[in-house]
Amino acid sequence: MSIPLLVIVSGPPASGKTTLARQLAHELNLPLITKDDIKESLFDSLGWQDRAWSKKLGAATYHLLYYFLEAALAGGVSLIVESNFGPMSTSELKRLQEIYPFRPFQVMCRADGKT
């Protein structure tokens, strides 16, 4: 089995991450996991309440994102993952790479604020 490729698309909000990730997934014919798609699905299923609820769903979103990511990597599947990953994400991605070796390729999106 070859070592899977993990394309990590990251950057601040409104920097074009999702647009780029969707285009890459289409062009490379790779599955795509996006944080916002997971969170929207949770909101659609569980509803909206207040800021505290949103934070709980945000934590659950990352838990599910890493769960899906781990399942794909365990199966040797190359894929794209998109989120505004923070510093805490590095340790989780390193942990996954130790268990399920993958070839990382990170794309960091930025915008000048005028877009």
Where are these regions (language model features)?
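Conserved phosphate-donor/acceptor-positioning beta-strand/loop module used by diverse small-molecule
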Residues: 99-115
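Hydrophobic anchor at the beta1->P-loop junction of P-loop NTPases
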Residues: 9
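Conserved substrate/cofactor phosphate-moiety recognition/catalytic segment
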Residues: 19-74
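The conserved Walker
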Residues: 12-13
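Conserved glycine(s) of the Walker
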Residues: 16
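Hydrophobic "anchor" residues on beta-strands that sit immediately upstream
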Residues: 6, 32, 78
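Glycine-rich phosphate-binding loop used to anchor ATP phosphates in small-molecule kinases
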Residues: 56-103
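Phosphate-binding P-loop
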Residues: 1-4, 73
